[in-house]
Design a protein with these regions (language model features):
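Conserved acidic carboxylate
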Residues: 41
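Alpha4 helix (beta4-alpha4-beta5 surface) of REC/receiver domains from two-component response regulators
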Residues: 51, 95, 109, 120-135, ...
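Active-site beta3 strand of CheY-like receiver
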Residues: 77-83, 88
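Acidic catalytic/metal-coordinating carboxylates
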Residues: 66-69, 92-98
């Protein structure tokens, strides 16, 4: 699993460590403001798992099960982060990402996007970077790896 980030990597400011079944993962002490995460994932069980885990960590989470609904939700709520699958119905993840990055609304352009997908080829990873994803993770993934990327993208969460 390879991850790339356009943004700076940040340390574990104000975080404590909590043991989990997977690995030791950082947990926020007292969030100053809950961060909003939008999950755009067509697999219900994957979306539900992510929603549950992220809510337990103090995030406000909403989910969309296709690209068109996800894009609409993003424009209406302006989340702090989007976790986006590439292979979703109605509007592929690549198009959702490109549409947000090419928007005239600066708030939409600046939303960090983590691609979380089963597409593991080097071409797909390069495409993710070219269209503006902040990170690219492949399925299957370890939740603690995803959480580490989230904390680096949203250091104040």
């Amino acid at each position: 699993m390879r991850v790339f980030l356009k943004r700076s990597w940040y340390g574990n400011r104000g975080l404590e460590m909590k043991a989990s079944a997977e690995k030791v993962i950082p947990v926020e002490k007292t969030p100053s403001k809950k961060k909003r995460i939008l999950i755009i994932e067509d697999e219900y069980s994957a979306s539900k798992f992510l929603t549950m885990r992220l809510k337990n960590l103090g995030f406000m989470v909403s989910a969309a099960f296709d690209g068109m609904t996800g894009l609409k939700e993003a424009t209406e709520t302006i989340p702090d982060l989007i976790i986006l699958d590439l292979m979703i119905p109605k509007l592929p993840g690549e198009e959702v990402c490109k549409t947000l990055r090419e928007s005239f609304d600066e708030k939409l352009v600046r939303i960090p996007i983590i691609m979380l997908t089963g597409k593991d080829s080097m071409v797909d990873k390069i495409l993710g970077k070219v269209i503006g994803a902040d990170a690219y993770l492949t399925k299957p993934y370890d939740f603690s790896d995803l959480f580490e990327v989230i904390k680096k993208i949203l250091p104040d969460a």
